[in-house]
Every structure is written in structure tokens, then in C-alpha cells.
């Protein structure tokens, strides 16, 4: 896992300034850990209207992105990034993007992301060029740009040196198959609500134990499905039981 180059085929390259100019991803770009390059299919059209879409065969609402502009943009991206880059289409039909999948993508040196628009892209392009399809959830968006940015952000967090603290990525939700624990900062008391005493104790072993207990309990309450695919250790089972007892007694 090292530096990452991401090439994005998109009709709206200006949207990706959110990645290159703000936050952790911007810092990764400045540090040379991440490179994001956009390719606009409109730049590969030959008609005066720069047409990138057409009506679907068989009728129906909406328009479909044409093969040729997409293919020519992909050729340019491949020439810039190399033939080994994995081509990913962001699509509601894809597999759901998980933290485990993000870890796998972070192992790549380069990725080419296809951000579709309209009703989608010509299926023949997908069959000929796309290696993987990924979805960020069971809902429909106006285009693939936001999912592409979600993927880039998630992958960037796993690049060595991208985060300010070496443990930050490991403590994120889902990294260990669990939701994150609650977090608190100053003041110690706000509107009569106190920070849990254990976090003020300075006892790091007790703090780690409390955080794990909270992560287990929160996952059980909010995303029990995550626990079904994770084998709990004896200590983790004990902590979860303790959490549930404390909850029921409160």
C-alpha cells in the first residue's frame, strides 16, 4: 500500500475540486500520496454540440451515454496511468462498497473510475472495459461523481501518511468490523452532561476496554448484522454482556 493515482471519467470534472482542494484528500494530494486526474468524454466528441448521450434502443425515458466518447476518454486515461489500472464503474447495480472492499482497493497503485450520468452507460462499454462495479448504497443518485468521491475519500484514508495520527484509520468505524465508540472533548460538563469518568482517568488499559465495550454495544444496537459475520473473542463476548447489563440497569 503506497501512493495512489486515480483517473476519473466524468462529465463534471469541476466537482472533484471537493477532493483535491479540501480536507484529508487535499492534504494527500499536496503530500504526493494521491493524484486525481479527470477526463471529460465531451472532449472526445466530434460534433459541434459535443454530444455524449443518445436515446435508448427499445424506447423508454431518459438518455444513455454513448460508447465512443467514453472509450476514447478511457484510452487517454490508460495511456496516462498504465494498462494495469483497474477500471471501476460506480453503479447501483454494483456490489455494495464496504470497508473490506476499500482495503482491497487501497492496495492498488492506480484506479480508473467511470462516473455515469443520465440513465446509465451503454452496456457494451461495461462488458468490454469494466473490471468491477461498486455501489455505495441502495438508492439512486443523479450521477456517479458523488460515489466516486466517496470511494476516493475512503481509500485515501488508508494510504500511509494520509491521516494526522497513525492510529486514526485503525480506529474508524468498520475497520475492525465494528461501529466506532462515542467520542468527547472539552468541556467536561455541558448542560449537566458529564464526560464518562473513565476517559478522564488516564488509565489507558481501562480506556481501551471501555471503548471496545461501547463499540460492541453500539454495533449490537445499531448494526447487529455486522456481528453475525464476525467471531467475537471470549473477552469481547464478556464486554458485550456487560454493556447490555449496564444498559438494562440504567
Swiss-Prot record:
UniProt GO cellular component terms: cytosol
CDD domains reported for this sequence: TrmD-like (cd18080)
Keyword Ribonucleoprotein assigned: no
Key words of the record: Cytoplasm, Methyltransferase, S-adenosyl-L-methionine, Transferase, tRNA processing
Location of the protein in the cell: Cytoplasm
Key word Transferase present: yes
One Pfam family here: tRNA_m1G_MT
EC id: 2.1.1.228
MF (Gene Ontology): tRNA (guanine(37)-N1)-methyltransferase activity
Gene Ontology terms describing biological process: tRNA N1-guanine methylation
Catalytic activity: guanosine(37) in tRNA + S-adenosyl-L-methionine = N(1)-methylguanosine(37) in tRNA + S-adenosyl-L-homocysteine + H(+)
Class of the enzyme per the UniProt entry, highest EC level: transferase
InterPro entries: Alpha/beta_knot_MTases, tRNA_m1G_MeTrfase_C_sf, tRNA_m1G_MeTrfase_TrmD, tRNA_m1G_MTases_N, tRNA_MeTrfase_TRMD/TRM10
Annotated S-adenosyl-L-methionine binding sites: 116, 136-141
Assigned protein family: Belongs to the RNA methyltransferase TrmD family.
Main function: Specifically methylates guanosine-37 in various tRNAs.
Entries under HAMAP family matching the protein: TrmD
Subunit and partners: Homodimer.
Name of protein: tRNA (guanine-N(1)-)-methyltransferase
Amino acid at each position: 500500500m503506497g501512493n495512489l493515482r486515480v483517473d476519473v471519467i466524468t462529465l463534471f470534472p469541476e466537482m472533484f475540486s471537493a477532493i483535491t482542494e479540501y480536507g484529508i484528500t487535499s492534504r494527500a494530494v499536496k503530500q504526493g500520496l494521491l493524484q486525481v486526474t479527470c477526463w471529460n468524454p465531451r472532449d472526445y466528441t466530434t460534433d459541434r454540440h459535443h454530444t455524449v448521450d443518445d436515446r435508448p434502443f427499445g424506447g423508454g425515458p431518459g438518455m444513455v451515454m454513448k460508447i465512443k466518447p467514453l472509450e476514447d476518454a478511457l484510452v487517454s486515461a490508460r495511456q496516462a496511468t498504465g494498462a494495469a489500472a483497474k477500471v471501476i464503474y460506480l453503479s447501483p447495480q454494483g456490489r455494495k462498497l464496504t470497508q473490506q472492499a476499500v482495503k482491497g482497493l487501497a492496495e492498488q497503485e492506480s484506479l480508473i473510475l467511470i462516473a455515469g450520468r443520465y440513465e446509465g452507460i451503454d452496456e457494451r462499454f461495461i462488458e468490454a472495459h469494466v473490471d468491477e462495479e461498486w455501489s455505495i448504497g441502495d438508492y439512486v443518485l443523479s450521477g456517479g461523481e458523488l460515489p466516486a468521491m466517496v470511494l476516493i475519500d475512503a481509500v485515501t484514508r488508508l494510504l500511509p501518511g494520509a491521516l494526522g495520527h497513525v492510529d486514526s484509520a485503525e480506529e474508524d468505524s468498520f475497520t475492525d468490523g465494528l461501529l466506532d465508540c462515542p467520542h468527547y472533548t472539552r468541556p467536561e460538563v455541558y448542560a449537566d452532561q458529564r464526560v464518562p469518568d473513565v476517559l478522564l482517568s488516564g488509565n489507558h488499559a481501562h480506556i481501551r476496554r471501555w471503548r471496545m465495550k461501547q463499540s460492541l454495544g453500539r454495533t449490537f444496537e445499531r448494526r447487529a448484522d455486522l456481528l453475525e459475520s464476525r467471531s467475537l473473542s471470549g473477552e469481547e463476548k464478556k464486554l458485550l454482556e456487560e454493556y447490555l447489563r449496564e444498559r438494562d440497569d440504567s
